[in-house]
Amino acid sequence: IIILDDLGYRPSDVAAFSLPKEITFSILPQTPLASKIALRAEQEGRAVMLHMPMQAQSGKDMGPLGLTTDMFAGAITYNLRKAMKSVPNAVGVNNHMGSAFTGQQKGMEALLKEVKRQGLFFVDSRTTVLTKGEEIAQRLGVPSASRQVFLDHKLEPAFLLKQFNHMKRIAKKNGHVVVIGHPHPETVDFLKTHLPSLEKEGLTLTSVADYFSHAPKVAKQFGKERNQTASLNNADVKDSKVSMTEENALHSSGLMHSSAEKGVAERLGTAPNE
């Protein structure tokens, strides 16, 4: 599974639509292009997520509707509901920044209870090793996963290739990988060039809608389409290819599933200043 974060501010973000529809867009709430991107994604059958702003340890500005560590549960619920109104077709949530917020229990419990009420899934972007996101999500019964690789916190071609290869190694070792990237022109161009190579290595890009098919809102929004292609998917089960889907990552930019093995998601690193 590959998730692209931070969509909604820049006109250049629409270039991400040139990528396969299995790539998930995570859209920032109340941004100038949020509704436009969400609507187009829905028309194309592409799953979208809400990229929910949360407080960082650095104190960096979160943007509209950010969640802070001093908020009461009611305020957290209110902000999430308001954020969802700007991306109404979102089927899941991941954190934008959040190295402070995701590390504290009460706020995350309030957030994830509302995520569950709305039938969404949660992907922990893991901007801190101290995050309690997936731990609490699992306890509350929220479908969840965790990011394993950040693709592009440096935009040099050599670094992008290094992370892309790292992604493939994890997928082959564990049977899946969850990757997060961003709609930078450099990232979009890199993915357009390198995604075709996955099939040659027995890797297949898979949408979060397929990985989280058990999440209520995913089932409601994508169930009909999935049923129409069920016979094809059943045939694919016999294939020995590794499927790039989103499990523990989010349990980008992505998860890869192997017909031969399913491992526990390997969690690596954090994004600087988030």
Annotate each PLM feature.
Residues 1-60, 64:
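Active-site beta->alpha N-cap acidic-glycine motif
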Residues 1-4, 64-74, 153-158:
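Active-site mouth loops of central-metabolism enzymes
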Residues 4-6, 27-29, 50-54, 95-97, ...:
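A cross-domain feature marking catalytic cores of carbohydrate-active enzymes
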Residues 23-27, 47-51, 143-148, 201-206:
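Short hydrophobic/aromatic-enriched beta-strand-loop microsegments
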Residues 44, 61-84:
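Catalytic-core regions of hydrolytic enzymes
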Residues 49-52, 71-72, 143-149, 167-173, ...:
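A polyampholytic, Gly/Pro-enriched intrinsically disordered region
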Residues 74-165, 172, 176, 182-203:
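Catalytic domains of cell-wall/extracellular-matrix polysaccharide-remodeling enzymes
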Residues 115-128, 183-257, 261-273:
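C-terminal domain-boundary segment and adjacent tail
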